[in-house]
């Protein structure tokens, strides 16, 4: 009995310590954010980490909702609700320039999202014009997709950045043409009945299996050249993928809804 009590106490202490550590890191990054203008070219770039060789896709969890099955876009529409105009072939879907972003027919709040993506194997352009797209949670909160392999750009717009806010902790990008993974744990913002913010959105993100955001608190919706404040919105909204004019590919997209 004593051993059990000691084990419980130690576990509680460890969890409390981890919670304080994450909170301290979040506060530190929030303080650092104030130092930098949005898309500041002088902001330090994240250190490069080799994620290792590509790995085969993992099986889809039994309780997951498959958003893209490699065959069709029946789960998606364009931004106006019409059929999605991207090209499906060979088990992936590719952005068609000027066809517009696409979004899921279903809406989601708190979730675990898995996305696999690849930029063109023969890169063209540089900076933000090289393999640019984005994964949007609730159509408002973007994790940047970009070819960041030997391709410098502003830090808060690099691959796996919470766009316009936080660069990834490291640059874990693979070579152009290689398949990459995002695993995103997302907690939606909370608003009261008057539309006042009760709790901000948070993200934990793994890029190619490497932690790049650790329960990071978002300052508001992500945007280009702006950091707008939160505005009340529905508890659940679609996931969307961005058409930024580059032929980025996606495959094996699934989501698990989480309890609040």
Which residues does each PLM region occupy?
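Positively charged n-region of N-terminal signal peptides that target proteins for export
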Residues: 1-7
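Bacterial N-terminal signal peptides
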Residues: 8-19
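Carbohydrate-interacting regions of secretory-pathway proteins
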Residues: 23-260
């Amino acid at each position: 009995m004593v051993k059990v009590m000691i084990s419980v106490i130690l576990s509680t202490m460890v969890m409390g310590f981890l919670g304080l550590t994450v909170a301290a890191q979040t506060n530190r990054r929030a303080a650092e954010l104030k130092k930098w203008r949005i898309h500041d070219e002088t902001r330090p770039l994240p250190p490069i980490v080799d994620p290792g060789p590509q790995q085969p896709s993992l099986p889809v969890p039994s309780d997951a909702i498959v958003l893209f099955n490699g065959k069709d876009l029946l789960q998606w529409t364009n931004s106006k609700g019409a059929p999605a105009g991207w090209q499906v072939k060979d088990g992936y879907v590719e952005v068609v320039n000027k066809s517009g972003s696409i979004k899921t027919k279903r809406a989601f709040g708190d979730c675990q999202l898995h996305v696999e993506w690849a930029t063109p194997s023969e890169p063209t352009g540089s900076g933000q014009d090289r393999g640019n797209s984005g994964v949007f949670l609730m159509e408002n909160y973007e994790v940047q997709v970009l070819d960041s392999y030997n391709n410098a750009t502003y830090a808060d717009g690099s691959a796996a950045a919470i766009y316009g806010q936080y660069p990834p902790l490291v640059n874990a990008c693979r070579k152009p043409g290689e398949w990459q993974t995002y695993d995103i744990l997302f907690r939606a913002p909370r608003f009261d009945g008057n539309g006042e913010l009760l709790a901000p959105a948070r993200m934990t993100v793994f890029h190619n299996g490497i932690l790049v955001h650790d329960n990071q608190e978002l300052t508001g919706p992500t945007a280009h050249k702006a950091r707008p404040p939160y505005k009340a919105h529905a508890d659940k909204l679609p996931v969307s993928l961005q058409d930024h004019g580059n032929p980025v590919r996606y495959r094996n997209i699934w989501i698990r809804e989480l309890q609040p």
